[in-house]
């Protein structure tokens, strides 16, 4: 999705991109645990993302200003790590394991079922912002594969049919 489209979409869902004083205080508390500001960036981005759901261009600009580092430095970290989201994501994050073991045990059928029922491709978010579908290389549950995680809930031995029931429980 183009950045301009994402920005326009975010305006429609009325997201405010301004850090509160309390959030700024917490950011400086995070920095205290690190030797440099740059080394604290991942934790800062995770903290900000927890509040806003994703890291917008406006938040990067504001962080650069208060941390006195370049936007490029922040963008570099934000785009490198797959768990830092640079566009709006769904209320429910679905991660399907695509490791070798899950692949052998049918993760492709799971992926196809999820894509069909959500009407999205991998890496996309549903139009109603209920779900985002992401691959993950291993959920550490290989003996019970295929496995998916929805938010913090792990589901084992899933089938292309059982994922449909799971989706309904998160509506």
Curated annotation (Swiss-Prot):
Domain of life the protein comes from: Bacteria
Complex and partners: Composed of 13 different subunits. Subunits NuoCD, E, F, and G constitute the peripheral sector of the complex.
Catalyzed reactions per annotation: a quinone + NADH + 5 H(+)(in) = a quinol + NAD(+) + 4 H(+)(out)
Record-given protein name: NADH-quinone oxidoreductase subunit E
EC number per UniProt: 7.1.1.-
Keyword annotations from UniProtKB, A to Z: 2Fe-2S, Iron, Iron-sulfur, Metal-binding, NAD, Quinone, Translocase
Function: NDH-1 shuttles electrons from NADH, via FMN and iron-sulfur (Fe-S) centers, to quinones in the respiratory chain. Couples the redox reaction to proton translocation (for every two electrons transferred, four hydrogen ions are translocated across the cytoplasmic membrane), and thus conserves the redox energy in a proton gradient.
Alphabetized NCBIfam families for the sequence: nuoE_fam, PRK07539.1-2
UniProt-listed Pfam families: 2Fe-2S_thioredx (PF01257)
Family indicated by similarity: Belongs to the complex I 24 kDa subunit family.
Protein species of origin: Buchnera aphidicola subsp. Baizongia pistaciae (strain Bp)
Spans through the membrane: none
Residues reported to bind [2Fe-2S] cluster: 97, 102, 138, 142
Cofactor note: Binds 1 [2Fe-2S] cluster.
Co-factor(s): [2Fe-2S] cluster
GO MF annotation, one: quinone binding
